[in-house]
Swiss-Prot record:
It comes from Mus musculus. Component of the NuA4 histone acetyltransferase complex which contains the catalytic subunit KAT5/TIP60 and the subunits EP400, TRRAP/PAF400, BRD8/SMAP, EPC1, DMAP1/DNMAP1, RUVBL1/TIP49, RUVBL2, ING3, actin, ACTL6A/BAF53A, MORF4L1/MRG15, MORF4L2/MRGX, MRGBP, YEATS4/GAS41, VPS72/YL1 and MEAF6. The NuA4 complex interacts with MYC and the adenovirus E1A protein. MORF4L1 may also participate in the formation of NuA4 related complexes which lack the KAT5/TIP60 catalytic subunit, but which include the SWI/SNF related protein SRCAP. This is Mortality factor 4-like protein 1. Coiled coil: none annotated. Residues 164-230 are annotated as: Interaction with RB1-1. Residues 323-344 are annotated as: Interaction with RB1-2. It comes from the Eukaryota. The keyword Acetylation applies. It is found in: Nucleus. The gene is Morf4l1.
Amino acid sequence: MAPKQDPKPKFQEGERVLCFHGPLLYEAKCVKVAIKDKQVKYFIHYSGWNKKSAVRPRRSEKSLKTREDIVALFPVPEGAPSVHHPLLTSSWDEWVPESRVLKYVDTNLQKQRELQKANQEQYAEGKMRGAAPGKKTSGLQQKNVEVKTKKNKQKTPGNGDGGSTSETPQPPRKKRARVDPTVENEETFMNRVEVKVKIPEELKPWLVDDWDLITRQKQLFYLPAKKNVDSILEDYANYKKSRGNTDNKEYAVNEVVAGIKEYFNVMLGTQLLYKFERPQYAEILADHPDAPMSQVYGAPHLLRLFVRIGAMLAYTPLDEKSLALLLNYLHDFLKYLAKNSATLFSASDYEVAPPEYHRKAV
């Protein structure tokens, strides 16, 4: 019997493609192709994701354990070697399986737009309720974590229920039989567990007001912000430092702050804006082409990140310990935002959009 031949790659080096990262599709470039254990993998570069402002952590032996812990809190999806972690390098490049890559053609570009629209609608609905999207949730109360499955409506125990998972293979097979094979990976992603960050009650009204001011009253948050995201994160780090933390804890806070900043810069343009804000965003990119958005936008958009960041983290391999540690840091920062909400959030930071802007936003 002849040996089984290696699979033939569908994509070539240098080819422009679309790649799943979390629930959305992003424009990317296939940099390298590799075949290992009869599986094709591609080294993907996401267009526009490499930021000049990326933070490189200090290398310190005494805080190595903390550093590794923090890297575990902000992981990239499966298949990416740790050397390409966004906290360790200025790159978001990663190795991905072939199932995550689609041809750059009109049909897949349409799917990209549909996924983006669905995410924005879900985001807006969540803001209307003053909380993160999602109706059916169950809690790991001791970890302050909420999870849900998109396919299984029943409540899920903290350690998982073997009986429920045995029923899941059938629906994806049926769906894959009816759709283009290149979309198969979406089903895999939609089956993942969603991690939810709890927004403090004091901040929920600001999410609703922010939504109302922009989508109903057609106002815009004044940019550049009087107090930008970089400044808010720096103030938080200094606040924690003033409370006499140990070197390791101080270092951990710095790394978490750097991670939040990176996620904000990557997610803003695709997941943190309402449709009415897009012309304003285009103007900002034209006027400040080299500036990270964390130097331009302020507290309202930073708060929106915490409604969405759980969805991104859901597509990464987090164990229970790392998840609890991550949420501890994120919730502590949210408490800081709530404590300082009077100075960080104000309706006076918005302005009515002029008539010419409305024509652009149509």
